[in-house]
Amino acid sequence: MIIFRTKLLPMVFKRHADTFFILVFSLIPLALHFPYRVNIFLSWEGAYRLYLGQHPYRDFGLPMGFGYWLLPALFFKIFGPNMLSLVKAQVILNICGGLAFRGILKRLDVSPGVRLAAVLTFCLSYILINFWPWYNNTDIIYGIVGLYFLMVAYSERSLSRGAGALAGSALFLFLSFFTKQDGGFLMVAVGLAIVVYEAVFGREWARCGIFLGSFALVAVLFLEPLRGTAFGYWFNHGQPPHTARLSPRDILGEFLEFSQWIKFYSLLIILIVVWKARRGSFWNNQREMVFLLVTLGMLGTAAIFQVTSYTPPDNNIFFHAFAIAYILDGLASLMSWDASRYAWLLLAGVLLWWSGSYFKYLNRLFPQPVAVAMGGENVINRHTYMINTDTAHIEDEGTWTEVPGMPAFHKIKMPPST
């Protein structure tokens, strides 16, 4: 029995290691204390008003769809209106996004080794940095879940079984759009590209109709209660006093002047596609084309999203995991090597590649000396060669503490002056 268990545990871990990574990285925030962030009031405000039963666009105004606050408001109902409930809501969003990304790769028949490396990339690049709910993250998470249901729908041979997945895809893609217009629209566009491809080349016209009908039905169910409200004013489509963020010149300029990773990935993907196409049957391969559409769609989304939603500057880095999954899968196919045999090497490479995501937290355990006054000692290095005389800098977060007697701010640190 002991021998059996000894052999069983590594097998179970190997089979579900990607799920393990998703759960661990998503649950990390529950064990931490957080410094208060000024803009987090936006997450609180909308969720709290929904928690009170107020009606969006009638009792309070929003510059976006209220899909952003649905899950935080639910967690306010379950755990009470406190800041930690927002963190718990983001934990669920991260788990859903990670599992949906994993599910997309499984439905695309990506090998376990490549899938494990891609999931770890997703965890380090996108899950680890997002521990507060934020609309520029929530819309992408909803979109990834919607794309997963789309993968499920088209992998089911039975139309009746696929219909439920198509309805689920329509729901989450609409929620993505109804959370943030730009990111949500781009995620819907990726989904529509897959639906149109399957309809034209796979003759899946019935599924196309079910998806479009489901999307229209979901839209009616969400928008009908908003009739007679100020939804048209608050929904930003560039009308005064809003301004349109969709500038082709800005998008092209950002892409050509910066976007090094997006351009690098695009070059590798083009080379892989050309190589595969020369070997024949690439353009008629449904799996290859859908995988390519998803990957290019996410790269295109990231290229536009970084201009239309420019804060925070790293809100578009979800594309890394999709791109590396396609590139590693393509290299494994072209070179005929089993990525699963080199899984640990791939994981080590990803950990080194994305070491900046976690090293900045580990580095806090060993703070470096900083020169704050002239001294007689001859200690000059890259950490001490400049004297900080700025008296207007933000207060050191190391001095922040919890506010006693305020349960809503449990485990949330604030400046002592607060």
Q: Which positions does each model-derived feature cover?
A:
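Perimembrane helix-loop-helix junctions
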Residues: 155, 186-216, 279-282, 331-334
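Short acidic/glycine- and proline-prone juxtamembrane loop motifs at membrane-interface regions
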Residues: 131-140
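Loop-to-helix entry region of an early transmembrane alpha helix in multi-pass inner-membrane enzymes
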Residues: 62, 66, 79-99
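Membrane-interface alpha helices of multi-pass inner-membrane proteins
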Residues: 162-181, 187-192, 217, 298-307
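Extracytoplasmic catalytic/substrate-binding loops of multi-pass membrane glycan-assembly enzymes
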Residues: 32-47, 52, 56-72, 81
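Membrane-lumen/periplasm interface segments of specific transmembrane helices
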Residues: 207-250, 257, 261
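Transmembrane-helix signature of polytopic, membrane-embedded enzymes
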Residues: 101-124
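Specific aromatic-rich, kink-prone transmembrane helix
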Residues: 139-158, 165-173, 194-195, 322-326
